Design a protein with these regions (language model features):
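Substrate-binding clefts and catalytic carboxylate motifs of secreted carbohydrate-active enzymes
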Residues: 1-156
Length: 156
């Protein structure tokens, strides 16, 4: 899930590969989303060379958003940043035909143990803990209602 294409030892034995990726959050998070996108494409180009037609599924991706936090220009933890991150990530997914699945982390915010990396829990949900939609929920509704049923016919 976290190996890179040139270091993964098990991927050649698998029928498909699954990855957890957070370019723009844990990797190159903040003001440099363009840098995160370029780094993500670089990794994906590497996967294109080693997958030989096998599908790739993203089993985790996302960014935290404190519900109700709005900032312009966008900053990490804001609704605007979460949407910009998701749009960038989806653009990378859509660029590669071998990407055949995506599972956002997470459906809804949830409580975690105390710590400096989480503000009263994990806030990567597209819904709040009370199951109210964040701005990202509307982005996903648009994406999921417009994705083609046959991924081989999607546009790049």
């Amino acid at each position: 899930m976290t190996s890179l294409p040139d270091t993964s030892k098990g991927q050649r034995f698998a029928d498909f590969v699954s990855l957890n990726r957070y370019y723009g959050w844990y990797v190159l998070g903040g003001a440099g989303l363009a840098d995160a996108e370029a780094a993500f494409h670089h990794e994906m180009d590497g996967w294109a060379k080693v997958l030989h037609g096998r599908p790739l599924i993203f089993t985790e991706y996302g960014t935290d958003n404190l519900s109700g936090a709005h900032k312009l220009p966008s900053v990490m933890w804001s609704a605007e940043y979460q949407n910009e991150y998701l749009e960038m990530t989806h653009a990378v997914f859509d660029h590669y035909d071998f990407v055949q699945g995506e599972l956002v982390w997470n459906f809804a915010d949830f409580q975690t143990t105390e710590g400096i990396l989480r503000v009263d829990g994990n806030k990567k949900g597209i819904f709040t803990r009370q199951r109210q939609p964040k701005d990202a929920a509307y982005l996903f509704r648009e994406r999921w209602t417009t994705l083609p049923v046959n991924f081989k016919k999607r546009k790049k």
